[in-house]
């Protein structure tokens, strides 16, 4: 097994420290190109997964790839290849979910927390730095105890053992209530499908989603769900006439 510095567990076997040789690692990484330009990025993502003993799994796959060549990449059920493929698919799925399930709060800067199974923060870095390039923000990973900081076009991922989100001020509470109001207003009660929602938005994400948190400062219900947020003197909303929803186009047949 491989252990990082500070993570060594008591064992009965001899432990040998391995010094990182960056030049050697670069040569090996570049050497993967002769098999496929996708091997290097694939193994990099495999390292960010939560696969148990992933370092050993990556080593066995890389050694076998050098022995057997690119034909190994066609054997998707290979005992050294398949576990990595499955782990990377799970990582990619979680990454896509967190691109949509991060909720920032304004506490002087934009702040958010995530609790992923895989180490997705390095992969989320480019997405949020590009999307929020005019902001100052940080994103804290509770699982891996690290945070992404961004300000003035510069970003860094640094270890952070503990972080407690500051309580929201009145302005932030109001924005949260507005977001919950929007979420509830666009819902079509007759078409609710809890099982489908959980398949697209698993319950483990819910505690950090603003729209699904309990609101101790909730505004009492009114005839219009968002009436409490209307500007003074604004006319009441006129309900839209009922419309019949057009059927969705059928998906094209997939290739065999």
Residue positions per predicted region:
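Long, low-complexity, intrinsically disordered segments
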Residues: 241-256
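Extended, well-ordered protein cores
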Residues: 1-244
